[in-house]
């Protein structure tokens, strides 16, 4: 079998005006998420695997027994488990005019997220989701020419129809050939490290601390205080493999192997782009394949934005301790995090307030690369226990979200009984 040494020029995919208009028509329409994530139930093992996939060894998440002695009375999941664990919701078929456009062949990446958490996910919980488009914005991007910005709402709830979290994911779609022609990042070089450089990184790892069982009370927090320093990196292909092992990255495109990959190519052919050997491979490999990343105008493979979201969440949960509650986190992915890059995460308290029974701490944090570039600025709000009650308050979702979750779970059960 001959193996070609070069690949054909990738097929050019551009936006269709009718797809853009269709997306605009669907803003505010909720739909059941009928495609499962890699895992469907938050078992002790899936919770542990997800936490470890981004480097988190918090016993609240990785030890099935540790949480029994805490206010949660059991093992709970780390904040972003929803990106790897969700069952398919059974739902009535959507009319063609209400189906979201696929934008096949168009490159997509996550530019930022805003997430609010309402209650813990426990071992044994099954998660479901519904969502919809919050807005549609067409613009000229400095990186890729014509681009489409789509904030997507994702509401996650459990088997009791209780809203667990609401997440708005800012996705950006770009035309691949335009990205290549602009070549904005051509001067960026891959990071290299001396033994001394690596020793400095290891010093930060060795000094990291987790608050754990030592309760951090709201009264003891001072505006201006630092949350400390965490390091992540240098980023390796191994990191991407391990992150996938936690469950992320398999929906909606379902990268797979063997006969399953053949079947997937029949389903979404434009998602497969020939590699240097002439073999169709997933466009998702931009996250681990330098050659493919360079072919679309990027200096090299880069991470998923959701990985850095997990890093930021790791930083916050380490600081707040077992008794705290991460109420909200909002991030922006302003620059790519390339293979070999190292990030230090820092943050400080910028405010304190009381809302009802919630004792809240507002935080600004960010991830800064070895180029001294802030690639992922973020804000967060943490609910901490006060000394009088001893408990961190949890927020309540809106009645509308509760109603939609109950309706969708009811229909899911009805269709399953047929």
Which sequence ranges carry the predicted segments?
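A structural microfeature
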Residues: 164-167, 228, 376
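Short regulatory "switch" loops immediately downstream of catalytic or recognition motifs
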Residues: 136-139, 251-255, 352, 385-386
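A short acidic/small-residue loop/turn micro-motif
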Residues: 135, 171-173, 234-235, 351-352, ...
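Hot-dog-fold acyl-thioester-processing enzymes
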Residues: 2-112, 178-323, 387-418
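Residues in well-ordered beta-strands of folded domains
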Residues: 84, 116, 170-172, 230, ...
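Charge-rich, low-complexity intrinsically disordered segments
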Residues: 348-353, 365-383, 392-397
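Hydrophobic beta-sheet segments that form the core/acyl-binding groove
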Residues: 111-160, 167, 224, 324-370
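Flexible glycine-rich active-site/ligand-binding loops centered on an Asp-His dyad
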Residues: 147-157, 167-188, 381-386
């Amino acid at each position: 079998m001959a193996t070609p040494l070069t690949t054909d020029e990738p097929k050019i995919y551009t936006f269709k005006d009718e797809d853009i208009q269709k997306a605009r028509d669907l803003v505010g329409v909720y739909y059941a998420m009928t495609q499962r994530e890699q895992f469907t139930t938050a078992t002790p093992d899936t919770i542990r695997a997800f936490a470890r996939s981004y480097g988190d060894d918090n016993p609240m998440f990785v030890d099935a027994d540790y949480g029994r002695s805490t206010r949660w009375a059991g093992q709970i999941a780390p904040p972003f488990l929803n990106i790897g664990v969700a069952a398919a919701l059974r739902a009535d078929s959507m009319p063609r005019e209400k189906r979201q456009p696929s934008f096949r062949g168009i490159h997509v990446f996550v530019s930022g997220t805003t997430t609010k958490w309402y209650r813990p996910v426990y071992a044994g919980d099954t998660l479901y989701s519904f969502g919809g488009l919050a807005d549609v914005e067409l613009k000229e991007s400095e990186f890729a020419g014509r681009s489409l910005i789509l904030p997507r709402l994702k509401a996650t709830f459990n088997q009791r129809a209780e809203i667990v979290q609401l997440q708005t994911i800012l996705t950006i779609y770009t035309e691949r050939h335009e990205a290549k022609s602009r070549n904005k990042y051509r001067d960026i070089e891959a990071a290299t490290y001396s033994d001394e450089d690596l020793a400095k990184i290891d010093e930060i790892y060795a000094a990291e601390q987790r608050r754990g069982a030592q309760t951090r009370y709201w009264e003891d927090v001072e505006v201006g205080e630092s949350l400390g320093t965490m390091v992540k990196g240098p980023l390796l292909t191994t990191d991407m493999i391990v992150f996938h092992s936690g469950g992320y990255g398999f929906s909606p495109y379902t990268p797979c192997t063997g006969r399953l990959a053949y079947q997937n190519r029949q389903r979404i052919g434009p998602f497969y782009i020939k590699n240097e050997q002439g073999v169709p491979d997933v466009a998702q490999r931009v996250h681990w394949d330098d050659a493919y990343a360079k072919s679309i105008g990027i200096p090299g493979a880069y991470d998923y934005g959701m990985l850095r979201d997990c890093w930021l969440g790791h930083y916050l949960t380490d600081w707040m301790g077992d008794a705290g509650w991460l109420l909200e986190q909002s991030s922006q992915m302003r620059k790519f995090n390339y293979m070999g890059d190292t990030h230090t995460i820092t943050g400080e308290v910028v405010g304190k307030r009381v809302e009802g029974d919630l004792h809240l701490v507002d935080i600004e944090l960010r991830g800064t690369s070895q180029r001294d570039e802030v690639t992922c600025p973020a804000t967060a709000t943490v609910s901490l226990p006060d000394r009088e009650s001893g408990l961190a308050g949890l927020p309540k979702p809106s009645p509308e979200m509760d109603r939609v979750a109950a309706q969708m779970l009811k229909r899911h059960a009805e269709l399953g009984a047929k």
